[in-house]
Amino acid sequence: VLTSMANQMELAKVKADRPATKQEEAAAKALKKNLIELIAARTQQQDGLPAKEAHRFAAVAFRDAQVKQLNNQPWQTIKNTLTHNGHHYTNTQLPAAEMKIGAKDIFPSAYEGKGVCSWDTKNIHHANNLWMSTVSVHEDGKDKTLFCGIRHGVLSPYHEKDPLLRQVGAENKAKEVLTAALFSKPELLNKALAGEAVSLKLVSVGLLTASNIFGKEGTMVEDQMRAWQSLTQPGKMIHLKIRNKDGDLQTVKIKPDVAAFNVGVNELALKLGFGLKASDSYNAEALHQLLGNDLRPEARPGGWVGEWLAQYPDNYEVVNTLARQIKDIWKNNQHHKDGGEPYKLAQRLAMLAHEIDAVPAWNCKSGKDRTGMMDSEIKREHISLHQTHMLSAPGSLPDSGGQKIFQKVLLNSGNLEIQKQNTGGAGNKVMKN
């Protein structure tokens, strides 16, 4: 058995920077199966358990060991650069473990250089796969941020069977996302640490399919929305503990305002229509927060966007165009179809959030596949906007220049490394996009 497993281990190794072959995938699956069987046989022998029970125990033990190994590896900042038409862009993915003011990370339950991978589905203390994602351009001798947001896994610890613990866990994860959002706004964070009660606007864009027909993403979306609702009652002040520059825990006061969306982006949503109605019941309310009660494309934006535009900011035209595009998509239900651009609504919501000085946050179930594609779509469009000073029209395919930007972003956005951090292998398993 051990000789066979050694051969499988050798076959399972991917020996170059390329996708695994079918033979390597089969060897990896066979190795996992044999390891679980070996643990089961040992458990049966030692503890006298029935075969079925021993196998169940072995499968859980194997998964727990996998999670522990992935969580305990170093989680470090990923930084990549790309050049297009003479401009130099930097993509940065900063993990929760490196969100620091002093020597330690800012979270009350410290990460200590480690992380929480997407497979840690019972964790009720930390958000899964929590990163701050930034794209900047080097101009006039300094770096200018084009976009910054927070990405993570679903707020639901969905394998926790106790409903009370699951809800507590979802709220703890939401608090970590809010803490990361505050960290992404240094001026606001400094005010909070100085004792001021600060208002924090967050646009949360879930990318799940809000249905339980295949998988349980419908329940996960409910858990996530419930967590946001519990933390953002009108006028509610919440207290977060943040580790300051001296390494001491300090209580800060924030008034969170969250516009919580969910936009299905995979085939189950966009080809089969699963979860669209449930998602849009959340989206209608969030759009009113963001754009006011009159969602006709020709109407002047209200809500958060209206407040921003009333200041006549430098980015007036970009904000107005994004708002109009979002209302057009909504009116025509374009977000219910792929149309060659599955992320059309989700991407524009995140971009609009950033432009009006709110914090964009987005997530799928794991925080790596759909979340990673969304990350790349946002960065592609921001680099394109910086190059051409024009926003793409919804449903339009990138021209050859846009395609080149996208290829560079896909390879240099940090998403391949995040995939490897969570699974041990780089790549992306998004259902056709």
Swiss-Prot record:
For this UniProt entry, what is the primary localization, expressed as one broad class? secreted
Which EC numbers does the record give? Answer: 3.1.3.-
Q: Which UniProt keywords apply?
A: Hydrolase, Secreted, Virulence
Where does the record place the catalytic residues?
364
Q: What class of enzyme is it?
A: hydrolase
Q: InterPro entries annotated for this entry?
A: IpgD/SopB
One GO term of the cellular component aspect? extracellular region
Q: Does the keyword Secreted apply?
A: yes
Q: Where in the cell is it found?
A: Secreted
* Classification via Gene3D superfamilies: Cell division control protein 42 homolog
Q: Name one GO molecular function term.
A: phosphatase activity
Q: Does the keyword Nucleus apply?
A: no
Q: Motif CX5R motif in this chain: where?
A: 364-370
Q: What does this protein do?
A: Converts phosphatidylinositol 3,4,5-trisphosphate (PtdIns 3,4,5-P3) to PtdIns 3-P and prevents the transition of PtdIns 3-P to PtdIns 3,5-P2. It is one of the known effectors injected by Salmonella into the host cell and is required for invasion and for an efficient generation and maintenance of Salmonella-containing vacuole (SVC). Alteration of the phosphoinositide composition of the plasma membrane causes membrane ruffling and actin cytoskeleton rearrangements.
Entry-linked NCBIfam families: PRK15378.1
Q: Which family does it belong to?
A: Belongs to the phosphatase IpgD/SopB family.
- Fill in the domain comment: Contains the consensus sequence Cys-X(5)-Arg characteristic of Mg-independent phosphatases.
Q: Which protein is depicted? A: Inositol phosphate phosphatase SopB
Q: What is the lineage of its organism?
A: Bacteria, Pseudomonadati, Pseudomonadota, Gammaproteobacteria, Enterobacterales
